[in-house]
Amino acid sequence: MTSAVLEKTSIHPSAVIHPTAEISEGVIIGPNVVIGEGVKIGKGTRVIANAYIEYAEIGENCTISPFSTIGSEPQDLGYKGEPTKVIIGNETIIKENVTIHRGAACGDFTTRIGNKCLLMVGSHVAHNCVLEDQVILANLVTLGGHVHVGFGAFVGGMSVFHQNIRIGDMAIISGFSASRQDILPYSKGEGRPPVPRGLNVIAMKRRGISQEVRTATNEAFKLLISEEYNTTQAIEKIKAEIPMNEYIEKMIDFIQTSKRGVLLKSHKSGYQSLDEE
């Protein structure tokens, strides 16, 4: 046990806690939990039975479910024990058997998960991933290293994603999907690859985005995925014909800054699916 444990904190006698761990007020630590070196846990967080945590900073009012592992070494052959970590925001829920690996020795050496995220049973977040606020990963989702998942994105169960790709804000991806290219913000996608099937209008409406803005964004989206135009032509047409807004600007910027390419068309128009390799 550690002197950093404050009043009103509950720690089960069978828990093992490293002397340097910083446990805040109101934290509950259940049976057989192991808290290793380099851990900070914020107020009101619950760590339920049999979880394992090391080299991680966890925010306030989070829930860490049984048999989850946070902060273990990255699956990177180049990792040589450098001081890396995981940072998790406030009010995030980590369900059973989730694995979150700490960063590899590149970038900022950190795997980051935002506020109010939900990682469902068995999902895996690899080294140096970034999940922005309110991301949901359904059961058994697997993210390769350095994947960036935007604000409010939802990823369906048993989906897998190549390292270094980006999933845009408020994108929704169906279960059993797989991609090695970036996923456009605000899009609905499914399959291998998850070809865009439409704009995630419901999510935009729930976020309070006006009908006028949703309509303009949808028109821009339809041009981007149209078989009639290549991406450069579609962007030129959008700028010439559609009232610009922050969501259209974000889609265009997302495309223009992509390093792996953005999945916009079906593989009939040139995309090679995973099954065709």
Go through the PLM ranges and name each one.
Residues M1-S14, P19-T20, E25-G26, N61, ...:
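Terminal amphipathic alpha-helical/low-complexity segments used for targeting or macromolecular assembly
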